[in-house]
A protein has these predicted regions:
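Hydrophobic positions on the alpha1 helix immediately C-terminal to the Walker A/P-loop
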Residues: 72, 76
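Walker A (P-loop) ATP-phosphate-binding motif of ABC ATPase nucleotide-binding domains
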Residues: 58
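Hydrophobic anchor at the beta1->P-loop junction of P-loop NTPases
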Residues: 61
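Walker A/P-loop NTP-binding motif
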Residues: 78-81
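Conserved glycine(s) of the Walker
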Residues: 66-69
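Conserved nucleotide-sensing/catalytic segment adjacent to the nucleotide-binding pocket
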Residues: 88-155
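A short, basic N-terminal segment
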Residues: 1-55, 190, 194, 199-206
Length: 206
């Protein structure tokens, strides 16, 4: 049985660390941090999943534009970098690579070797799922880059965090029943139902 990654700390401590990482990310973007009930709920769900047993081996952060999804993903990346959690068998420390969904399609067409490596990294963040072309053509061959990547990560049970503006129904329509059903098995869904932070008054853009 493949072990699931979990942060070795209490849920409350993970919440506090994630909050600090989000505040740092907002400050890095020269914005003003503003907490609210929606963000607190999202943080609580994220902290709970990261510290407790679950059959899911990934997270889907879904919701409208500009409401904190990408910020949450980047904050988690910064938290991992700061914690230096050791991997088994002296293989270094955990870290997550983040790529835009459109970059996955680009790699598939332009750098096959890098594409194969990306598919199999132990921790991957996919930002803006659904913005990429569904298919790419290379020398007459048609590929489905994101579908192929998600299929491989499902089969290998690899840790994956995804952000998307698509609803679950739109994901099913866009990627088909097979991928939608596999995502249901792969990921814990955290819904970002709040409005955009991309205003002159508020912060935490996503």
């Amino acid at each position: 049985m493949k072990a699931r990654f979990r942060i070795p700390m209490s849920e409350d401590k993970a919440y506090a660390y994630l909050l600090a990482a989000i505040m740092a990310e907002v400050e890095y973007r020269h914005r003003v941090f503003c907490s609210n009930e929606d963000m607190e709920k999202q943080l609580q769900e994220m902290a709970h999943w990261l510290t407790t047993p679950s059959s899911h081996f990934g997270i889907l952060l879904c919701g409208g534009c500009g409401n904190g999804k990408s910020t949450m993903l980047k904050a988690f990346q910064q938290l991992l970098n700061a914690l230096h959690i050791p991997k088994p068998y002296n293989e270094g420390t955990y870290g997550i690579r983040i790529v835009d969904a459109k970059y996955i399609a680009y790699l598939c067409k332009n750098n096959y070797e890098a594409d194969r490596k990306l598919i199999s990294v132990d921790m991957l963040g996919i930002d803006d799922l659904g913005t990429e072309p569904s298919e790419v053509m290379d020398y007459g061959n048609i590929y489905t880059p994101v579908i192929d990547l998600l299929t491989k990560r499902y089969e290998e049970q690899l840790f994956t965090i995804i952000t998307t503006n698509l609803t679950p129904q739109q994901i099913r329509e866009h990627y088909g029943d097979r991928i939608a059903d596999r995502l249901n098995e792969m990921v814990k869904k955290i819904v970002f139902s709040n409005g955009t932070y991309r205003t002159d008054q508020l912060a935490t853009p996503g």
